[in-house]
């Protein structure tokens, strides 16, 4: 967990420094950000809600596991991996700014959420972030306000669609590995058994799956889906 969290920060920091990102620009409205940004912010606010409930119930271990799953499965292995080209691109476009603002908020919020169970590590990472932006005029993460869930940003349908994309992509990559076909080698078609609801959700994230698994076409086979 600590390694993944730190590696995510190490990915963010050099590009942010190179582009001079200090969070001085106006917020890009969430509604105007790409779907991948809206998804991770929805997951982040769901995390805030669930972690806050865990702490209220004196369940720090459960809170830690939730934070760990978010960082590993959603932030690092999905959001950052799918958005790398947005940070690499030339120029300082609104899309790149939205990516910086989104990832920064995720990193800062995770630092605050983990502070009660990892006080020293959380403080170091938090201060590394705010020392550049000055968004919080505090000298420690332990003096910062604890995150508050914004229910208006949570989109459970979007979270469900992206979860399906992650599951299908993982299965597709596992099949590649099983038959020793590297991801760099494009494949013609992936066939997925679906029902009507699953098909509609997967259609919305079809391009993500195709890019992640490196296939040219997805064929939805009508029938029961698991």
What are the functions of these language-model segments?
Residues 1-226:
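Feature 926 captures the class I aminoacyl-tRNA synthetase adenylation module centered on the KMSKS loop
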């Amino acid at each position: 967990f600590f390694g993944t969290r730190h590696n995510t920060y190490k990915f963010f920091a050099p590009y942010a420094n190179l582009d001079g990102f200090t969070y001085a620009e106006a917020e890009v409205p969430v509604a105007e950000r790409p779907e991948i940004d809206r998804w991770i912010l929805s997951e982040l606010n769901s995390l805030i809600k669930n972690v806050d409930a865990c702490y209220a119930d004196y369940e720090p271990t459960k809170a830690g596991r939730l934070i760990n799953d978010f960082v590993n499965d959603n932030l690092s292995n999905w959001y950052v991996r799918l958005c790398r080209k947005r940070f690499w691109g030339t120029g300082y476009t609104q899309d790149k700014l939205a990516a910086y603002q989104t990832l920064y908020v995720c990193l800062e919020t995770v630092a605050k959420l983990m502070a009660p169970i990892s006080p020293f590590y959380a403080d170091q990472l938090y201060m590394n972030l705010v020392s550049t932006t000055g968004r919080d005029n505090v000298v420690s993460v332990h003096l910062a306000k604890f995150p508050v869930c914004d229910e208006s940003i949570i989109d459970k349908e979007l979270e469900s669609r992206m979860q399906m994309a992650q599951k299908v992509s993982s299965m597709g990559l596992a099949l590649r590995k099983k038959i020793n076909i590297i991801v760099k080698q494009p494949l013609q078609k992936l066939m997925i058994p679906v029902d009507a609801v699953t098909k509609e959700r997967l259609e919305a994230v079809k391009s993500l799956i195709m890019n992640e698994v490196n296939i040219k076409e997805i064929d939805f086979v009508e029938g029961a889906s698991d």
